[in-house]
């Protein structure tokens, strides 16, 4: 028998307890600008840390391979219904452990090994699972990659030409580091011209889509995948969505289980349900509006500080910065900003001469700082401090002074009270 007091984490494993405490401290004292990160609510974390973690539940709600699933069934059913309502679809699979797992399931459902897939190049802002040669998607399948035009938008002419030449079985519209708006209709027209399945990866913009502030990929796409964290502000996990296609939905069901996963993580699914409920509240729309406003506030200052922004600016929550003119690499800038209590990630830019481990760019975003309560004034401050450090990487005085100012700002906006 366990005692919550006697068997607490602090009493059981002091090393892990201390590591978590240090991470809590870091999250409080640092400004989080990584575009794919956010802060989950206490309710989401409570569900994820619940006794549902103990329950095995292979299969789907109402059709399990284990007994005793009547209560976890409630959680999964609620998660599905809320996801359907949030995105206006009639099918949602809430079981994928991650966005990559959701993408893998779609591949598994509609393709055979060796089939051709057309996706965005990693260097242009795509994701590993969109056909990168180091990923399963570029090893098992014949991957063809499209990029950006000189204006910084998706090169739809190139997409159409590559589709005509290679006849892909599936086209992926989505990104990991692109600050523009995707034209789903154009992608649909291109996909129809070669009879390809069209998949949208909305992992980065799902919250904006749910709030009606970014174009919904439906009815243009056959399937959409997303993570449940990032702009959705839920637990780390994946989600598959489709509409008006029961045959395809059936394939996705079996592609997840028994295709690539066994028992679902019921504690995470419960946490997803909570996050979806939060996202259905009117306040979530206000939050997403502020996410866009804050991204624009940072864009304004960074342009004034002569930091080059790929695609000329942002129309979503993220900005991809080309810092070549500073004389420092993305790796150097990431480390310097970390010492200044500003967390970012180094990121390749289009036609980057440096390796992905070094890079010439940084990717930043506004979801986490907006959750924290930052408005335009704070975001302008942060952008100025970021520029100060990026132009002075390794300058201990600048880094230390910035770290002090960041910590003082963070004290005014605690993540959790």
Swiss-Prot record:
EC number: 2.1.2.1
Location, primary (coarse class): cytoplasm
Needed cofactors: pyridoxal 5'-phosphate
Pathway: One-carbon metabolism; tetrahydrofolate interconversion; Amino-acid biosynthesis; glycine biosynthesis; glycine from L-serine: step 1/1
Annotated GO MF terms: glycine hydroxymethyltransferase activity; pyridoxal phosphate binding
Residue positions binding (6S)-5,6,7,8-tetrahydrofolate: 122, 126-128, 355-357
Superkingdom of the organism of origin: Bacteria
CDD domains listed in its UniProt record: SHMT
Chain ranges passing through the membrane: none
A Gene Ontology term for the protein's cellular component: cytosol
Compartment(s) where it occurs, according to its Swiss-Prot or TrEMBL record: Cytoplasm
Gene Ontology biological process terms from the UniProt entry: glycine biosynthetic process from serine; tetrahydrofolate interconversion
UniProt modified residues of type N6-(pyridoxal phosphate)lysine: 230
Keywords in alphabetical order: Amino-acid biosynthesis, Cytoplasm, One-carbon metabolism, Pyridoxal phosphate, Transferase
Catalytic activity: (6R)-5,10-methylene-5,6,7,8-tetrahydrofolate + glycine + H2O = (6S)-5,6,7,8-tetrahydrofolate + L-serine
NCBIfam families: PRK00011.1
Quaternary context: Homodimer.
Name the record gives this protein: Serine hydroxymethyltransferase
Gene that encodes the chain: glyA
């Amino acid at each position: 028998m366990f005692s919550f007091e006697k068997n607490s984490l602090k009493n059981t494993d002091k090393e892990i307890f201390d590591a978590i405490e240090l991470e809590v401290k870091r999250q409080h004292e640092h400004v989080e600008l990584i575009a794919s990160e956010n802060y989950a609510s206490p309710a989401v974390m409570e569900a994820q840390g619940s006794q549902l973690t103990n329950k095995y539940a292979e299969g789907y709600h109402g059709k399990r391979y284990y007994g005793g699933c009547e209560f976890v069934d409630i959680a999964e059913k609620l998660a599905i219904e809320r996801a359907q309502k949030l995105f206006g679809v009639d099918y949602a699979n809430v079981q994928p452990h991650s966005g990559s797992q959701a993408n893998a399931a779609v591949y598994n459902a509609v393709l055979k090994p060796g089939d051709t897939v057309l996706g965005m190049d990693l260097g242009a802002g795509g994701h590993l699972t969109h056909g990168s040669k180091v990923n399963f998607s570029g090893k098992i399948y014949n991957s063809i990659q499209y990029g950006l035009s000189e204006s910084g938008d998706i090169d739809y002419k190139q997409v159409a030409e590559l589709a005509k030449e290679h006849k892909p079985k599936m086209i992926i519209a989505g990104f990991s580091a692109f600050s523009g708006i995707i034209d789903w209709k154009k992608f649909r027209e291109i996909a129809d011209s070669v009879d390809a399945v069209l998949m949208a990866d909305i992992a980065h913009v799902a919250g904006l889509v749910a709030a009606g502030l970014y174009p919904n990929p439906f009815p243009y796409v056959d399937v959409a995948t997303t993570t449940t964290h990032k702009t959705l502000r839920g637990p780390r996990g994946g989600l598959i969505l489709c509409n008006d296609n029961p045959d395809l939905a059936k394939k996705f069901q079996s592609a997840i289980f028994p295709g690539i996963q066994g028992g679902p993580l019921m504690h995470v699914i419960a946490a997803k349900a909570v996050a979806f409920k939060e996202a259905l509240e009117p306040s979530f729309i206000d939050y997403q509006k502020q996410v866009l406003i804050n991204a624009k506030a940072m864009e304004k200052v960074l342009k004034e500080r002569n930091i080059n922004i790929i695609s000329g600016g942002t129309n979503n929550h993220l900005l991809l910065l080309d810092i070549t003119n500073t004389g420092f690499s993305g790796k150097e800038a990431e480390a310097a900003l970390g010492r200044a209590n500003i967390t970012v990630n180094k990121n390749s830019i289009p036609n980057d001469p440096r390796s992905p481990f070094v890079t010439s760019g940084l990717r930043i975003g506004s979801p986490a700082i907006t959750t924290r309560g930052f408005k335009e004034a704070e975001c302008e401050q942060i952008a100025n401090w970021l520029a100060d450090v990026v132009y002075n990487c390794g300058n201990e005085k600048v880094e230390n002074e910035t770290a002090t100012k960041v910590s003082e700002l963070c004290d005014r906006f605690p993540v959790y009270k």
